[in-house]
Amino acid sequence: MASREIWSLAGTFSTWVKGFFILLILSVCASSLQAKEYAAEQQRLDKFFPGASLSAAEGDYQVRTITKGDEVLGYAFQSIRVTDMPAYSGKPINMQILLDPEGVIVDAYMLEHHEPIVLIGIPEQKVHDFNANYSGIHVDQRVVVGRSSDKSAVTVDAVTGATVTVMVINEIVMRAAHTVAVDLGLVEAGATARPKPALVREDVFQPTSWTELVGNGAIRRMHLTRGQVDDAFKGTEAEGVDVAAAEQRDETFIDLYATHLNPPTIGRNLLGERQYADLMANLKPGEHAFAVLANGEYSFKGSGYVRGGIFDRVQLRQFGDTISFRDLDFIRLSDVYAEGMPEFFEMAIFTAREQYRFDPGSPWNLELLVRRQVGPVESIFTSFEMPYVMPEEYIERVPLTAEELAAIEEANRPLWVNIWYQKSFQVGVILVALALLTVILFLQDKFTQHPNFLKRLRHGYLVFTVVFIGWYALGQLSVVNVLTFVHALVQDFRWELFLTDPVIFILWVFTAASILLWGRGVFCGWLCPFGALQELINEAARKLKIPQYDLPFSVHERLWAIKYIVLLVLFGISLESMMMAEKAAEIEPFKTAITLKFDRQWWFVAYAVFLLVINIFTRKVYCRYVCPLGAGLAITGRFRLFDWLKRRKECGNPCQICANECEVQAIHPDGHINHNECHYCLDCQMTYHNENKCPPLIAKNKRARRDKKAPAAPQLIPVQVVEP
């Protein structure tokens, strides 16, 4: 009768959990179906430019001009047209950016995102409030989220719980705004933070031959054969177009030389005194002249500049910026005076104007573009780059202060590197904590022989996991991380996506390593903040003598399946829509209890509190039966290499002490440990080494003491025969 009631209770509990999960999925997914009657982008335009007209989208970046009558008021565009930088979710955030004609940001508004913490968690209004900081910022200014060593930078506060998301938004807004402003001619091209341009030493001149200039790197050469050019088009639609015959592959396609003419030792030796003086007189401050000379069948000038005014076959690149040349930047070069110079079929001088902020002391590349026609109006381009570095004796570098050097280094670092620098304290503390945990795990046999010390150490570690890893560093791993990783593997995997959150990245690396060595238990028992919170609450309940309830093992074993079903459902939803899967992943209370510290809508808080209340009476109910992350880790845990949890042949038959004491019921009645369920608390190992508690060990010690007291060899008792 009792058994039947238990099975009925288990069935009811299982049905309730599944029903609750389905209800939660439906409720959170339904919130994404709200229709928008009025486009948000038009609302923002009406707010900042009331009564203005909007042109059709134009150019590579689909920029729309905002006008009122004949007056241009500004420009509107979407960041997705400029950069597709992935955010924390692995997908880009789309921002509508409004600029005024002076290159000042009027508005930056988030149109679309897939960020889990913002979809359900942090109110979206907090992100909109963050974006309001960009109003009034010039596109050439540097904006930093958090601290910065650059005193000239504009610093803005992050959104708690969404630091990575807003740092990506900052990168997207400033990069897109600057790129479009340059394209529109509102600001000068160039990076917003770079070294101070070096100065050309006009006092340094030495008569030098062509051979010497080539030898010291002042003149650079790029020789391309027809075969090399054909090979560059392999794998494109232009493969096989205009290819050279086998005997023609070694023929010269172009033999190209380039140099910077401003240094007197180069310019005067090549152009002669008068031609060099005329050239320098026509250059404005900050402008630089370059000579390009070539032989071969390919013309670096082409004929495009005649029709469109732009040279489409040759350009310079420095600091990631492209320096294009127009017909007004071109001077015909016919007379060259350098001793030993070969004859050239084609020669030209190009001028980089002051707006490009060219630095003669920094490396640059001459880029040669080669085009092949693949259709009536379609062409395929490939490029060949020739690097150039100015010899040091021709320039003078302007020394930078320590602050300027630090600011330049910070500005030129990738986004994920800056995030690691900003979170260096959290990273350092967590690395030390993981090192301590590694020592505990490798020396577990020593630690478990001192149970009182190990229990205090473990409880302290769990407090650290909840307070520091969870609530401070926001290092709560989630099944969403797993789904994102799986989708990244089959789509567009980029390491920087996972490196943007250093705490999560480090914890995942350690968790992956620990799974291979010991199974899922190390993370679930030591590093999961919500799991640690449950365990500490349950420990307090036991101290208060609150009754504890455990299901019969046969029922408990069958309820394990729920978490695997939850994982499969989430994975199936993610195949259809990752956004829906992120909403459905609210079956995890992690975001509520850890990331947002219970600061969200009451129904989410009620769900998390409900799980913690159940945990008072039965330890880690959520972890045992519902957690999809634990299910995913358990599946990968089957690849573990070692089994360091020791057992005796008497474990399970007849001894049941460890099985009865295991707080998560991970030990089967027959004595073996189920590593899919074990949380690696090491309680069973403390019992294993406890000479006053482990029955087989007690019996073994009794035998040893008895054997020690027994004589080593039988002693003969002397007998004296007495005659009668």
UniProtKB/Swiss-Prot annotation:
<keyword id="KW-0804">Transcription</keyword>
<dbReference type="GO" id="GO:0045893">
    <property type="term" value="P:positive regulation of DNA-templated transcription"/>
</dbReference>
<dbReference type="Pfam" id="PF12801">
    <property type="entry name" value="Fer4_5"/>
</dbReference>
<protein>
    <recommendedName>
        <fullName>Regulatory protein NosR</fullName>
    </recommendedName>
</protein>
<dbReference type="InterPro" id="IPR011399">
    <property type="entry name" value="NosR"/>
</dbReference>
<feature type="DNA-binding region" description="H-T-H motif">
    <location>
        <begin position="215"/>
        <end position="234"/>
    </location>
</feature>
<dbReference type="InterPro" id="IPR007329">
    <property type="entry name" value="FMN-bd"/>
</dbReference>
<keyword id="KW-1003">Cell membrane</keyword>
<comment type="similarity">
    <text>To P.denitrificans NirI.</text>
</comment>
<keyword id="KW-0238">DNA-binding</keyword>
<dbReference type="InterPro" id="IPR052378">
    <property type="entry name" value="NosR_regulator"/>
</dbReference>
<dbReference type="Pfam" id="PF04205">
    <property type="entry name" value="FMN_bind"/>
</dbReference>
<dbReference type="GO" id="GO:0010181">
    <property type="term" value="F:FMN binding"/>
</dbReference>
<dbReference type="InterPro" id="IPR017896">
    <property type="entry name" value="4Fe4S_Fe-S-bd"/>
</dbReference>
<keyword id="KW-0472">Membrane</keyword>
<keyword id="KW-0805">Transcription regulation</keyword>
<dbReference type="GO" id="GO:0005886">
    <property type="term" value="C:plasma membrane"/>
</dbReference>
<dbReference type="GO" id="GO:0003677">
    <property type="term" value="F:DNA binding"/>
</dbReference>
<keyword id="KW-0010">Activator</keyword>
<comment type="function">
    <text>Transcriptional activator of the nitrous-oxide reductase gene NosZ.</text>
</comment>
